[in-house]
A protein has these predicted regions:
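Helix-to-loop junctions at the C-terminal end of transmembrane segments
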Residues: 63-76, 164, 267-281, 365
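Helix-loop boundary and gating motifs at the non-cytosolic
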Residues: 2-61, 210, 214-257
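A late C-terminal transmembrane helix in Major Facilitator Superfamily
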Residues: 337-368
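Transmembrane alpha-helix termini and helix-breaking/packing motifs in multi-pass membrane transporters
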Residues: 155-176, 356-372
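Intracellular juxtamembrane helix-capping segments at the cytosolic ends
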Residues: 118-133, 241, 321-334
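Structural signature of the two symmetry-related core transmembrane helices
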Residues: 78-93, 176-179, 283-297, 375-378
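Hydrophobic core of transmembrane alpha-helices in multi-pass small-molecule transporters
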Residues: 22, 103-120, 228, 308-321
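Cytoplasmic helix-loop-helix junction between adjacent transmembrane helices
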Residues: 111-151
Length: 405
């Protein structure tokens, strides 16, 4: 099972940039729940917490594809000043919460932080695409990065919850750790020039101008729309679980329960990447989305937190394989000089979905409690199924034209 992973991590510089990428991606699992807990504690409003999260992720969605397009042209170090701006804005948000500033101050800082962060996951996967030669190796690498995402989502929520709910520490301590990880991890990753994909330069800019826009790629559109709704599922789920744990008198267990999703996903990611699958990518994708919806639909019937935790672990086993396949679909279907942009569109739509799901679930929970949040999770999960199955023919046609080796 481990030989495939050992082989790719032995590539020059591979282990180092993957580790740096993991540290740089830690904020994605910490900022949302840290912000939610801190704002709810200081402002007593799930709605405001949802608004801050939504603004962060919508700002990310507005700028990330543009930044990714520039990265494909000018190289990954193009991101350094933007990431530093993101870190400074996050510090501003921490200060605003600490001194109970007007909500507008939080929203402005959140917009800047999200709008300048870029997609670190896309940068890491672009390095793997540049470093590796065969589709089988890339499949293993993308599964590994999905597993690394889940490591972040196991450690991050638990760490954030422990920090924020520990009385001697400030309620912003989770955000403080997150911004530190972002700064250190990003600079470590971007300083590794040996594995950085070569900048395409002005010639690539002219070539991109003459190409069809990446969003005219049918496979990317179907995959991105499905990920948009799945992101809504994840955003709603995060808030619903925090609300459920709070209603049961165990708010401090929120991070541990959220980590159950990631634990199941991590196990599935490692298994999925250890072998080669003979099903067509489009079939793997639509089946994965369907299984994920079936599992997510059980949460609305949860009588207690034990049920939520077990259902989360089982449902989570569909997450990493589904998103590994989604990234493979994009990697196979877009042009080589559009890979970073294509992969970023997936993370962009996921984050937009998370923001919308968080906001809608926050409203539902303020009105109907945790049950309303889990109802939002169920609706979004089956909407994703409808989109994936409706686009299966487009996926098959687009991938067939590209002729996967």
């Amino acid at each position: 099972m481990t030989s495939n992973y050992v082989n790719i991590l032995r590539k020059p510089g591979a282990f180092k940039f993957s580790a740096a990428g993991l540290l740089a991606r830690m904020p994605m699992s910490m900022v949302s729940i840290s912000s939610l807990l801190a704002i709810q504690s200081e402002y007593h409003s799930y709605t405001l917490a949802g608004q801050v999260s939504a603004v962060t992720l919508i700002a990310f969605a507005c700028t990330a594809p543009w930044l990714a397009r520039r990265v494909d042209i000018y190289g990954q170090r193009f991101m350094i000043p933007f990431i530093m701006a993101s870190c400074l804005a996050m510090v501003g948000e921490i200060v605003s919460i600490t001194f109970h500033a007007h909500p507008v101050a939080l929203l402005v800082c959140a917009a800047i932080a999200g709008g300048t962060s870029g997609s670190m996951g896309a940068l890491v996967r672009a390095r793997w695409s540049n470093l590796l030669e065969t589709p089988d190796e890339i499949h293993t690498a993308f599964a590994l990065e999905a597993a690394m995402d889940e490591v972040a989502f196991i450690v991050g929520p638990i760490l954030a919850t422990m920090l924020v709910t520990n009385p001697p520490l400030p309620v912003t301590s989770g955000l403080i750790v997150a911004v530190t990880a972002q700064a250190v991890g990003s600079l470590w990753f971007l300083s590794q020039r040996a594995t950085e994909p070569p900048a395409k330069g002005r010639a690539a800019a002219q070539e991109q101008t003459g190409q069809s826009h990446v969003l005219r790629n049918g496979a990317l559109v179907v995959t991105a729309l499905t990920c948009l709704v799945l992101g809504g599922l994840f955003g709603a789920n995060d808030v619903a679980i925090v609300a459920s744990a709070t209603e049961h008198g165990h708010k401090n267990l929120s991070g541990a329960i959220l980590a159950c999703f990631s634990t199941g996903s991590l196990v599935a990611a490692l298994i999925h990447g250890s072998r080669q699958w003979h099903w067509p990518l489009q079939r793997q994708f639509v089946v994965g989305v369907t299984v994920l919806a079936l599992g997510a639909s059980t949460l609305i019937f949860a009588p207690n937190l034990w049920f939520v935790a077990v259902a989360a672990a089982i449902t989570g086993m569909a997450i990493a394989p589904t998103f590994t396949t989604a990234n493979q679909i994009v990697q196979h279907s877009v042009a080589d000089n559009q890979i970073t942009e294509g992969l970023t569109w997936l993370s962009t739509t996921i984050n937009v979905g998370v923001s919308v799901g968080t906001f809608l679930a926050g409203l539902a929970i303020d009105n109907s409690g945790a049950h309303g949040g889990f109802l939002a999770v169920t609706v979004m999960s089956w909407l994703a199924v409808v989109i994936a199955w409706s686009g299966a023919r487009t996926l098959r046609r687009t991938l067939g034209v590209r002729q996967i080796p």
